[in-house]
Amino acid sequence: MSVELTPPRSDGSVGFAPVVVPPAPRKPLRRRAVSDLEKLYKVKRRLVFGADDGAVDNDTSNNNSGSSSTTSRSRRKTAADVVSDSPKRTDDSSTAGEDGYTHCVHSCACTPGERHLLCCELVSIGDSVSVARCPLCSLGISTTYLSRGCCRGRSKVTGGDEDEEDEDEEENSQDEDRDEEEAASASSSGGLEWSDDSNSALSWSDENIIISPFPGLKCYVTTFEDIRQPVLLETGSAYLPVYVPYDESFCRNRCLERGGDDDDERDATLIGKGSFGQVWRLSDKKTALKAAASESINETLLTVWISGVVRSRAQDAGYRGELDDSVYCNILVATGSCLRHNLVSFASFDRDLYNYRGWHYAGLASYRRAFSGIADALRFLNLRCGVGHFDVTPMNVLINYDRADDRQIARAVICDFSLSQCHTEGTTGHCVVVFQQTKTVRALPKSAYYLTDIYHPAFKPLMLQKLCAIEPRKQFPKPSANRFCVSDLCALGHVAAFCLVRVLDERGQLKVRSTSEDALFGVARKTCDALARHSVDEVANFCSLLITRQLAYTATLLGSDDMREPMARLCDYFETVSDKDAPDRFRSVYKRARREIDGSYMVRLLLAASETEDGRYLLDNIRATCLMVDSEDLDVDPYKIFP
């Protein structure tokens, strides 16, 4: 059983109290693709406020559920969906779509969890490549003949009558004869070797070059000889390719240590579990593995791409890697990955801020250094790397504490890019990852910046939270690198307020968790559940309730006087976009939130903290970030926040 250090008694002694640590609040489910969403007409939404159960008008709820089902039916399948939905076949199925791409589906002996890695590619008809085998099991289409970078051979185009199919077969037969002559000629002149063996698989990618499905991008296998971790290697083209090397010993030493479904086979220890996967600490105590929760490799793609960009940009700026090249500028980056097991490796830390047990007034100076360092990391990530973190929470700040005094934080880093999105100007849609393991090139999903897809509901900046209360599917207002950076810093301000309440409340962390934090996370959990159900009206209602909880948290630290202006601006906004009675309902729910999140037990330590330089630094930056309620506030200088 854990114990919690309580505030010193009057006689100077220290007491201990048993603690039952609740699990960390989960974040929203994975963001939806752009094609999963439809534009909604702007309507005046009647804010419910105080309805904690999320009850909404039935007619409105039905309308939105119908919209969600329509959206789901109209969703365009991804390449992975095409493969997983297709029955296993022994021939090549290739169809030409309206977007100018040929969708090539290849059969292989891989499991569904492995098959999505390569067996379906979007192949440009003009100047790209057809991959005719699976790099994992080396099986695939054996009778596909390739010429001039186009998909040919026994590919059947769906549609048409039998006569047209006969004509196509005759034309294909003539094409095959011509292709055989050209291929034999190319082989004799030193080109790609061609074989008429019907059991041999063909691919344009070989031991020397990886030809990608993206026009103008060629990647050479020899590039991997000089790199050991994911790194960005710019070639002057319109692409930002991150090369991810692979060593066979990675699986032997790391993947297999995590073991299978039987816990007895594992040497690793499970230290974290959430919506996006599991985190394991290996037996060396220095390495952690994050295994994705789903078969999709999108999160692995995003993680290794951001890690490569951060590593490259940091080295260019003169930063040196720490902890085996796993930390740059207080950002935790991946040191390796395995697509077969869909996981990435990092350096291991003691714990995260949410599960940290050493909060104490004596550690105030170290907490200031920690938040200042995380702010530097967010500025570097947004302004130098072109990446918005969009998930700044206590659960995503990892720390090592001082072994001599666990009340002091020795090191803090930002981690977890599950909700991150790229905003590199001029290169959106051109961020690609080159994998040595499969000799393939894959692109990151395009960024959409939908407000419901970014940030944990409990720590979402207020100017975005209020927009979600009216239009949950609204996109980020006037996106830019500066605005994204300020938004991340505002989320960091809410995290600082959350942690400072733990430090200053003399009732101890156990009582804070069961009162103030429960009031905040209780509504946040309902918001996540509503997001999973795609219930737009419930999401809007719970976001409006979260605003009052976030303001109440801030008020316990700053006092009522500082809350008057942001409260007045929010009331004016709700009256304009909703109805004239909305401000009264908002004030009523805010008063109830103030009673639930009680700051009366913080008065003594709060006054003491306000008289110290470290305490004033934290309080001033909480004031600068947690009271931003208008989207225009995002245009401030990010270097003036947590400087």
Curated annotation (Swiss-Prot):
Resulting phenotype, K290Q: Complete loss of kinase activity
BP GO terms, sorted: symbiont-mediated perturbation of host cell cycle progression; viral process
Acidic residues composition bias: residue spans: 160-183
Record region (Nuclear localization signal): 25-49
GO cellular component: host cell cytoplasm; host cell nucleus; virion component
Active-site residues, record numbering mapped to chain: D391 (proton acceptor)
Region called Disordered, residue ranges: 1-30, 52-97, 155-199
Record GO terms (molecular function): ATP binding; protein serine/threonine kinase activity
Disruption phenotype: Deletion mutants show a loss of typical nucleocapsid clustering in host-infected nuclei.
Family: Belongs to the protein kinase superfamily. Tyr protein kinase family. HCMV ganciclovir subfamily.
Protein name, per record: Serine/threonine protein kinase M97
Gene this chain is encoded by: M97
